[in-house]
Regions:
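Conserved beta-strand positions in repeat-built beta-propeller and related beta-rich domains
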Residues: 31, 40-42, 47-53, 87-93, ...
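A short loop-to-beta-strand structural motif that recurs across blades of beta-propeller domains
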Residues: 55-57, 94-97, 138-141, 187-189, ...
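Beta-rich, blade/repeat-based domains predominating
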Residues: 31-44, 72-83, 112-126, 157-174, ...
């Protein structure tokens, strides 16, 4: 289990030039498995996967399929975990909440009027949502009522993050992790909460067309889904630096790790 990272200072600033690579170590790759959006669920100790169909799949942290069901949404483009289940999005502005067995919790809705091309989605510890879109390239924080709390344009980063596809956050370091696909750098961007670029790690040697990213925080296990490459790669990951004073709420430890 990773040690607590509290008591360290908050890093501030904006994107800086020449970021290095994070400490990322490839463990294994699951081939012939399409993953366009992935999210770690501490409550069930597993990884939820969307493959741009009507289904979502639950995997163990070791990559074994545990569950699969129809969501009732024609196409699931992105997903994230909430207390009562999953928030799913079709990539065209429609969102829906379902429980962990696939039953609808509420009717389809719009999370925010500004969202039309949602590629990646992550519910943060404070209840707000980190969202990435690629047309235009932007990273946003959206309040539960739809208010835009932060909007950063990826083409202004150094190096540019032009095709952000998946997003998650490490509750220990506070860092935001974003993958962009082969129309961009096919890399993992590690960002401070304000968008400062901490590291950029190329992923092309592990797979083609990175689109999903998830993190099991207590072990530092990182999952990257490759769409065009039809693969799920598993890594050990260590943050470049700590950008928050106190670790965020992350849910229960996984009993099977």
């Amino acid at each position: 289990m990773r040690k607590s990272l509290g008591g360290l200072g908050l890093a501030v600033g904006m994107a800086v030039g020449n970021p290095g690579s994070a400490d990322i170590y490839h463990r294994e790759t699951i081939s012939d498995f399409r993953a366009v959006s992935i999210a770690y669920d501490a409550l069930v100790c597993g990884i939820w996967v969307a493959n741009e169909s009507n289904e979502v799949v639950l995997l163990s942290t070791f990559g074994k399929e545990l569950r699969r069901f129809d969501t009732g949404m024609r196409t699931v483009r992105s997903l994230t975990v909430e207390e009562d289940g999953l928030l799913i999005a079709n990539g065209w502005g429609e969102f829906r909440r379902i429980d962990r067995d696939g039953r609808a919790i509420d009717a389809p809705f719009r999370l925010s009027e500004t969202l039309y091309d949602t590629e990646g989605l992550h519910r943060d510890a404070d209840g707000s949502f980190l969202v990435v879109e690629d047309d235009p390239s932007r990273l946003m924080r959206i309040a539960p009522d739809g208010t835009v709390l932060m909007e950063l344009f990826g083409d202004r980063f150094d190096p540019p993050m032009t095709e952000p596809q998946g997003i998650t956050r490490d509750p220990y370091s506070g860092n935001i992790l974003v993958v962009d696909d082969n129309e961009g750098l096919n890399s993992l961007f590690e960002l401070a909460p304000d968008g400062r670029v901490l590291s950029v790690s190329p992923l092309s040697q592990y797979g083609f067309d990175a689109e999903g990213v998830a993190l099991q925080p207590e072990t530092g296990t990182l999952y990257v889904g490759f769409d065009g490459g039809q693969a799920l790669a598993i890594f050990d990951w260590i943050p470049t630096e700590i950008t928050i004073d106190t670790p965020l709420e992350r849910g229960p430890d996984c009993a099977y790790s």
